[in-house]
C-alpha cells in the first residue's frame, strides 16, 4: 500500500463518522486569487502549520498553531495553510479554527478532501480556501467537489503532480493550481517537478509550487512561472519562524 492509499483508506473511515454540519457564516478576508493577481512583483508565500508527516514523523509536536500563524502573518505570508489530518499529520480542525480566529489573512484547509462534509466543516472552521488533490480523487469526484466548494463560496487550490493532472485542472477552470513537488505515493520530493510542468501552463490561473523549499535559492528556481510557494516543514523546524519566512521572499 502506498502512502496515499493508506491515507485515503483512513480518510474514508474518518468521513463516515463525520457529522454533516449546517453551513454557517463565512469568515471575511480577501480572495487569495485576487491577492496573487495584484501582487506579482514578489513570490508570495503560503506558510504551513504542520506538526508531523508520514515520511518525516514528528516535526514540531509542541507548536502553538496560533503563535506560529501570527509569526507567518507578521512575515508577510499571503495565506496560512493548516494541516487538519489527525492520524498522519497530527493536525485537527481545531487547529484551523483557532488560527482562523486569530489572523486576518486567508486560511487554507490542508487535508485529503473526499466529501462535501469536509468542505462545510472547513468553511465553518474559518477556511476560505480548500485543497482538492487530483491524485486522491476520480475525475467525477473532483468535478463534484470542485463545484460544491464554489457553491459554498470557497476558493479551491487544485493540486497536481504531472502533465495529465495539470491538463485536468486547467480543463475544469481551476483558478488556483498547486504543483506538488512531492509524489504522494512515495513521498519523495523534487523541485524539478515544478520546473518541468511550468512549460504546460496555459490558463489564467495562479500557480503555486508546493514542497521542498528551504532557501531563497530554492524559491528562485520557480519564481519566473509561479506566483507563490507553499512551505511547511522548513518553517516548522525553525526557532524563529517569522525570520525564516522573511528569508524566503524572492523578487520575480
UniProtKB/Swiss-Prot annotation:
InterPro entries, A to Z: Aldolase_TIM, Indole-3-glycerol_P_synth, Indole-3-glycerol_P_synth_dom, Indole-3-GlycerolPSynthase_CS, RibuloseP-bd_barrel
Keywords: Amino-acid biosynthesis, Aromatic amino acid biosynthesis, Decarboxylase, Lyase, Tryptophan biosynthesis
EC number assigned by the record: 4.1.1.48
GO biological process, one term: L-tryptophan biosynthetic process
Primary enzyme class: lyase
Reaction equation(s) it catalyzes: 1-(2-carboxyphenylamino)-1-deoxy-D-ribulose 5-phosphate + H(+) = (1S,2R)-1-C-(indol-3-yl)glycerol 3-phosphate + CO2 + H2O
Pathway: Amino-acid biosynthesis; L-tryptophan biosynthesis; L-tryptophan from chorismate: step 4/5
GO molecular function, one term: phosphoribosylanthranilate isomerase activity
Family membership: Belongs to the TrpC family.
Name of the protein described by the UniProt record: Indole-3-glycerol phosphate synthase
Organism: Listeria monocytogenes serotype 4b (strain CLIP80459)
Gene for this chain: trpC
Amino acid at each position: 500500500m502506498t502512502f496515499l492509499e493508506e491515507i485515503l483508506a483512513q480518510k474514508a473511515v474518518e468521513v463516515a463518522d463525520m457529522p454533516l454540519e449546517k453551513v454557517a457564516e463565512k469568515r471575511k478576508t480577501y480572495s487569495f486569487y485576487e491577492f496573487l493577481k495584484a501582487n506579482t512583483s514578489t513570490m508570495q508565500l503560503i506558510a504551513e502549520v504542520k506538526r508531523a508527516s508520514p515520511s518525516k514523523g514528528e516535526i514540531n509536536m509542541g507548536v502553538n498553531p496560533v503563535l506560529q500563524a501570527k509569526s507567518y502573518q507578521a512575515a508577510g505570508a499571503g495565506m496560512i495553510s493548516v494541516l487538519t489530518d489527525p492520524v498522519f499529520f497530527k493536525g485537527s480542525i481545531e487547529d484551523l479554527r483557532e488560527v482562523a480566529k486569530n489572523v486576518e489573512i486567508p486560511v487554507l484547509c490542508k487535508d485529503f478532501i473526499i466529501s462535501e462534509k469536509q468542505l462545510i466543516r472547513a468553511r465553518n472552521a474559518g477556511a476560505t480556501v480548500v485543497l482538492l488533490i487530483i491524485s486522491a480523487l476520480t475525475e467525477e469526484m473532483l468535478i463534484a467537489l470542485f463545484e460544491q466548494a464554489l457553491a459554498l463560496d470557497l476558493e479551491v487550490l487544485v493540486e497536481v503532480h504531472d502533465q495529465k493532472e495539470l491538463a485536468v485542472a486547467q480543463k475544469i477552470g481551476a483558478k488556483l493550481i498547486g504543483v506538488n513537488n512531492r509524489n504522494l505515493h512515495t513521498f519523495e520530493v523534487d523541485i524539478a517537478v515544478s520546473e518541468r510542468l511550468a512549460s504546460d501552463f496555459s490558463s489564467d490561473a495562479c500557480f503555486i509550487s508546493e514542497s521542498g523549499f528551504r532557501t531563497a535559492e530554492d524559491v528562485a528556481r520557480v519564481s519566473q512561472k509561479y506566483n507563490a510557494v507553499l512551505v511547511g516543514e522548513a518553517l516548522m523546524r525553525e526557532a524563529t519562524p517569522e525570520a525564516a519566512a522573511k528569508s524566503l521572499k524572492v523578487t520575480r
